[in-house]
Amino acid sequence: MTTLDLTARSDRGRVYWLLADCWNIVRRGLTHYQRQPVNIAWQLGFPILSVLLYGYVFGSAMKVPGGGDYKDFLMPGMFVMTMAFGFINTATLVVYDSTKGVIDRFRSMPMASSAVVAGRGVTDLITACAELAIMMLTAFAMGWRPDGGLGFLGAFGLLLWLRFALIWIGVWLGLLVPNPEAAGGLFAVAFPLTMISSIMVAPQLMPDWLGWVAMWNPISSTAAATRELFGTPVGGDTWVEQHALLMAGVWPVILTLVFLPLAVRRFKKLSR
């Protein structure tokens, strides 16, 4: 009979084992994708379908304030929408692990609770990079031509920054909902929240009250900031529109400060 040597973990620093535990969770998540290629194919295929569908269906039917090509306006919004919808996949994977007993096994191991949560987040961030790369290549093939250089890299970083913040909402919700079917129902909540934003239509073209809500939607700030960095700024008259770059950095910080502790606390509560 073998026993688990817990003293070995005390020989090294807490940070080391936190990172080691986090990496084990990341490796487990990536291996899961490798063994179930259908899941990753769908996760990477949906962004392509979104770009093609919205790009060709709405590409010549919508107007942009101040003129300009709607495709240049739409593509950054589509990138933001995919990052926003990603939290549903996070929640679904977390609740799937919970119902299959995987979370119980993690709780029985001598590993940090925060490492389990963080490992899920890092895994999803890696897949988000792949999603963005595929979407941008598809958009480029459709004729989208952003400005290159630091602006392009900055926009890519802001998109991942938003995804990073929304991951913790997905983890928290995944630990709350009872089954994967209920997690799938989160789409009914996410869809209107993403539509009431500037990802497809400028808030100036909405009714006044709805436009005000859309302007203060965190998704709108990231959409406006990425458009500016990609070289197709839209602008606006309100403070939040004129400071889109600032708010695109601030909103994810607020969301992370709120939902990351909630996710870790919920995981610890399950351990009691």
From Swiss-Prot:
It comes from the Bacteria. It is found in: Cell membrane. GO terms for biological process: response to antibiotic. Disruption phenotype: Deletion of the drrA2-drrB2 operon decreases by 33% the daunorubicin (DNR) titer in cell culture. The drrA2-drrB2 mutant is more sensitive to DNR. Deletion of the drrA1-drrB1, drrA2-drrB2 and drrA3-drrB3 operons almost blocks DNR production in cell culture, suggesting that disruption of these operons impairs the efflux of DNR, resulting in intracellular accumulation. GO terms for molecular function: ABC-type transporter activity. Pfam families: ABC2_membrane. Residues 38-270 form the ABC transmembrane type-2 domain. Keywords: Antibiotic resistance, Cell membrane, Membrane, Transmembrane, Transmembrane helix. It is a multi-pass membrane protein. The chain crosses the membrane at residues 38-58, 73-93, 124-144, 156-176, 182-202, 244-264. The keyword Transmembrane applies. Induction: Expression is repressed by the HTH-type transcriptional repressor DrrR1 in the absence of daunorubicin. The keyword Protein biosynthesis does not apply. InterPro entries: ABC2_TM (IPR013525), ABC2_TM_bact-type (IPR047817), ABC_2_transport (IPR000412), T7SS_ABC-Transporter (IPR051328). GO terms for cellular component: ATP-binding cassette (ABC) transporter complex. Disulfide bonds: none annotated. Its main location: membrane. Belongs to the ABC-2 integral membrane protein family. The complex is probably composed of two ATP-binding proteins (DrrA2) and two transmembrane proteins (DrrB2). Part of the ABC transporter complex DrrA2B2 involved in daunorubicin efflux. Responsible for the translocation of the substrate across the membrane. Confers self-resistance to daunorubicin, an antibiotic produced by S.coeruleorubidus. This is Daunorubicin resistance ABC transporter permease protein DrrB2. It comes from Streptomyces coeruleorubidus.
